[in-house]
């Protein structure tokens, strides 16, 4: 058979493109060329004649026109349907060509400033932008950022009022994605100053203004997503796509930014105050989760100024944000009790209920996250805030003079000619392969006189005068003086350190973590959210947040006064024990009614009660008389000793009786096999696993001890009684056998005959070779299944469980207990199944 060339392999379209390109240059029609089916394939396969034509400036300009021009006319097709407009097809093909992985096209565009200016004039269009056009524009420029990073970044930084132009289209998601792509190019190992430049252009403050409660909610939600994305890519981690802490994320937690944000969130008279509150809380939550100081590789408390000078890549400090939000707790409490938007009763299948509302839920969620933040070690340290203030003061001075260590590049330490150079200097290209001055966790190099070179040139980032070598050396000496308390050395330099009075005043303030807990106690935060737990019995999102707060309070280190005070407040003011009992009684009344059902909070109520009981068991010796009266109350004791115990037992009960593994064995066995428990090692192991899962560690050891003794004695005396495991198996098997009716036996026989007939029919159409292969596969499958079927006991794998035995128990135990335990471990490690009593 012969293929007709030109149809199956695309030669026809290729020849058509060649025919168009063979025409005189002034007769080539770009539109006609783009309408050919194979033009994209030819472009991506690097057709030299096609690329030569496409790389011409006038052709590239026309391709850009196809992307930018708007043609909203829709021409109906002949059959009355809708046909894709011609201009839409041309825009798509033009964007695919400009974003194709062809180096010559990318280079021809980026190096032609006229073309780039024309392309970026798209931002000058009046909004709202066409979403399809915006996606094409973003796609092309993201490709340019990937392939020609330095040139594209340099061009973007040359655009006048870039931040204003791009935020003019904040409601267009494709444009915001392009902004995030631009920021993400400023990685730690190849930092090119994008974050610092956007900081100097006022990006964060411009975004923040769009979160005003007087701005349209759709714009607010889009801007909030952009800010959260900036926080995510600025996290202090080594994950792919993360650029690390930077000037933008640091500005987000500054006093000015947080003050403005809290004012927006609490402006109840504004038309869209609820939207501002919801978005503000989501931003704060993202800040806390992405900047947990407990996970910093180098904690700030271990970064003295003389050995770790501040950089823009230092970990983000959340103390200022936490203090400002703690001061606003009274305002948030008013909104929680009386939100700006009240919803009517909502009909459900079980009656009308009062909806919680987004404002209430977000405030409760904010409380939980602020509590998480207050428990960070840095925010619980008395010296943490003062130390961070000194670092921030020095960092601001260095940044203003464009000499912060973030912008320095250092070569290998062993290189005698190693120098520091500014990222924006003319000599940057000569040092672009050198290592960065610090990594993403804020570590900075030792700055010495030999390797210091701070000669800078003009840059778009800052107009400040660069500091000289002597000034920088003075600053470093001042940093050392601050660290060692040398006031004389600090006064001899142009750099003015923080006054000692400011530092002392900061130390006199309550520790930030404790300050939040004090505000919680004074404003009855815990009692309020506990009331909401029972007022909204069907909102499981709220129940989960309340449980999070309770377990944080009760599991915090109680050696700190405010942690213990907050826990006591939960009992005294929050009356958590009384409310748990009340919730249980209310649920019992509902269940007792005809067609009654459990309250929606009962699952969380049980685990909250478990946390309370655990706390009481650990710290009851420190309780005062009022607390003792609460926990010794008759209703509470009855709940703990009866209701809660019954609930635990019910929750731990196997719903289906036997475990699925044992049920499977029972179904596959006939009556004769079922009566002989000792011939069923698989079933024996399944029962052993069940006993282990439902018994204590001591019970498991006792079972193994009896198994080992019975196994050794079976050879000597066949008349011995069965061991406990065999007795349990025989009991279960006899119970199953006794309940099997004649109908069940007939069903088993029918299934057996049906299976035999099916097997015989299948064997008629299979060869002996196939049978052998099938047997091999079955053997392999069984061996694999057995490997997974007999896992080693978790009790013996986890060595920590062995330490649960007290010293007295070890002394009172028999000498053979260790041998028995070793025997059981050896049996498990060898993958054996314990068989006895054949």
From Swiss-Prot:
Biased composition (Acidic residues): 690-700, 714-723, 768-779, 806-818
Sites of Phosphothreonine modification: 419, 493
Alphabetized UniProt keyword annotations: Cell cycle, Cell division, Mitosis, Nucleus, Phosphoprotein
Residues that bear Phosphoserine: 411, 418, 425, 459, 468, 491, 494, 711, 713
One Pfam entry name: SAPS
GO MF entry, a single one: protein phosphatase activator activity
Major localization listed first in the record, in broad terms: nucleus
Region Disordered: start-end pairs: 411-468, 690-745, 757-838
GO CC field: chromatin; cytosol; nucleoplasm; nucleus; protein serine/threonine phosphatase complex
Biased composition (Basic and acidic residues): 423-442, 724-734
InterPro entries: SAPS
Any one biological process term the GO annotation gives: cell division
Subcellular location: Nucleus
Skewed-composition ranges (Polar residues): 448-460
Stated role: Has a role in chromosome segregation. May provide a dynamic connection between kinetochore microtubules and kinetochore chromatin.
Subunit annotation: Interacts with ppe1 and mis12.
Membership in a protein family: Belongs to the SAPS family.
Protein name per its UniProtKB record: Extragenic suppressor of kinetochore protein 1
Lineage: Eukaryota, Fungi, Dikarya, Ascomycota, Taphrinomycotina
């Amino acid at each position: 058979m012969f293929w007709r060339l030109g149809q199956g392999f695309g030669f026809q379209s290729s020849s058509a493109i060649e025919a168009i390109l063979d025409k005189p240059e002034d007769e080539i029609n770009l539109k006609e060329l783009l309408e050919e089916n194979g033009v994209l394939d030819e472009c991506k396969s690097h057709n030299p004649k096609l690329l030569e034509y496409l790389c011409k400036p006038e052709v590239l300009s026309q391709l850009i026109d196809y992307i930018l021009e708007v043609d909203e006319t829709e021409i109906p097709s002949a059959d009355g349907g809708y046909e894709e407009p011609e201009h839409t097809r041309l825009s798509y093909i033009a964007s695919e060509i400009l974003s194709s992985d062809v180096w010559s096209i990318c280079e021809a565009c980026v190096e032609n400033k006229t073309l780039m200016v024309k392309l970026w004039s798209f931002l000058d269009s009046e909004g709202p932008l066409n979403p399809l056009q915006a996606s094409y524009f973003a796609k092309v420029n993201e490709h340019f950022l990937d392939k020609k990073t330095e040139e594209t970044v340099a061009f973007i930084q040359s655009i006048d009022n870039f931040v204003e132009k791009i935020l003019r289209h904040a409601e267009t998601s494709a444009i915001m994605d392009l902004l995030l792509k631009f920021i993400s190019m400023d990685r730690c190992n190849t930092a090119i100053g994008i974050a610092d430049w956007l900081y100097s252009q006022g990006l964060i403050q411009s975004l923040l203004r769009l979160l005003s409660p007087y701005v349209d909610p759709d714009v607010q939600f889009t801007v909030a997503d952009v800010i959260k994305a900036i926080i995510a890519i600025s996290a202090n981690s080594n994950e792919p796509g993360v650029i690390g802490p930077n000037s933008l994320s640091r500005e987000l937690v500054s006093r000015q930014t947080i003050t403005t944000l809290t004012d927006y969130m609490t402006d109840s008279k504004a038309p869209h105050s609820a939207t501002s509150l919801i978005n503000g809380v989501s931003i704060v939550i993202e800040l806390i989760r992405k900047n947990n100081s407990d996970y910093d590789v180098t904690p700030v408390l271990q970064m003295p100024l003389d050995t770790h000078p501040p950089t823009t890549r230092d970990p983000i400090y959340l103390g200022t944000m936490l203090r400002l939000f703690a001061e606003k707790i009274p305002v948030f409490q008013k909104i929680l009790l009386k939100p700006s938007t009240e919803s009517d009763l909502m009909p459900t299948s079980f009656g009308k209920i009062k909806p919680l509302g987004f404002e209430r839920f977000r405030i409760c969620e904010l409380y939980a996250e602020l509590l998480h933040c207050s428990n960070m070690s840095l925010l619980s340290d008395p010296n943490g805030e003062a130390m961070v203030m000194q670092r921030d003061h020095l960092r601001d001075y260095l940044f203003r003079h464009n000499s912060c260590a973030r912008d320095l590049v250092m070569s290998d330490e062993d290189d005698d000619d190693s120098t520091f150079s500014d990222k924006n200097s003319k000599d940057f290209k000569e040092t672009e392969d050198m290592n960065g001055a610090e990594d993403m966790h804020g570590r900075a190099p030792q700055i010495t006189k030999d390797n210091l070179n701070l000669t800078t040139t003009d840059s778009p980032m800052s107009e400040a005068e660069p500091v000289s070598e002597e000034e920088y050396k003075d600053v470093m000496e001042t940093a050392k003086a601050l660290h060692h308390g040398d006031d004389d050395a600090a006064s001899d330099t142009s750099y003015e350190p923080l006054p000692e009075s400011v530092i002392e005043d900061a130390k006199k303030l309550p520790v930030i973590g404790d300050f939040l807990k004090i505000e919680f106690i004074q404003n009855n935060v815990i009692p309020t959210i506990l009331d909401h737990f029972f007022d909204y019995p069907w909102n499981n999102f709220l129940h989960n947040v309340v449980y999070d707060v309770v377990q944080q309070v009760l599991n915090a280190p109680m050696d700190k006064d405010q942690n213990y005070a907050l826990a006591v407040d939960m009992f005294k003011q929050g009356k958590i024990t009384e409310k748990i009992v009340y919730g249980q009684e209310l649920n019992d009344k509902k269940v007792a009614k005809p067609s009654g059902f459990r309250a929606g909070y009962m699952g969380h109520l049980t685990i909250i009660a478990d946390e309370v009981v655990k706390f009481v068991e650990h710290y009851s010796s420190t309780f005062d008389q009022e607390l003792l009266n609460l926990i010794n109350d008759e209703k509470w004791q009855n709940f703990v000793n009866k209701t809660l115990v019954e609930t635990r037992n019910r929750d731990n009960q196997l719903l289906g009786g036997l475990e699925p593994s044992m049920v499977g064995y029972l179904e596959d066995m006939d009556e004769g096999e079922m009566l002989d428990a000792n011939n069923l090692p698989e079933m024996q192991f399944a029962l052993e696993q069940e006993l282990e899962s439902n018994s204590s560690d001591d019970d498991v050891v006792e079972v193994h001890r009896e198994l080992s003794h019975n196994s050794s004695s079976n050879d000597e005396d066949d008349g011995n009684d069965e061991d406990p495991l065999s007795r349990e198996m025989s009991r279960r098997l006899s119970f199953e056998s006794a309940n099997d009716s004649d109908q069940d036996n007939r069903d088993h026989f029918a299934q057996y005959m049906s299976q035999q007939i099916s097997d015989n029919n299948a064997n008629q159409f299979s060869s002996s070779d196939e049978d052998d292969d099938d047997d091999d596969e079955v053997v392999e499958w069984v061996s694999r299944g057995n490997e997974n079927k007999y896992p080693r006991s978790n009790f013996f794998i986890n060595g920590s469980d062995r330490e649960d035995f007290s010293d007295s128990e070890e002394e009172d135990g028999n000498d053979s207990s260790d041998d028995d335990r070793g025997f059981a471990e050896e049996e498990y490690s060898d993958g054996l199944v314990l068989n006895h009593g054949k």
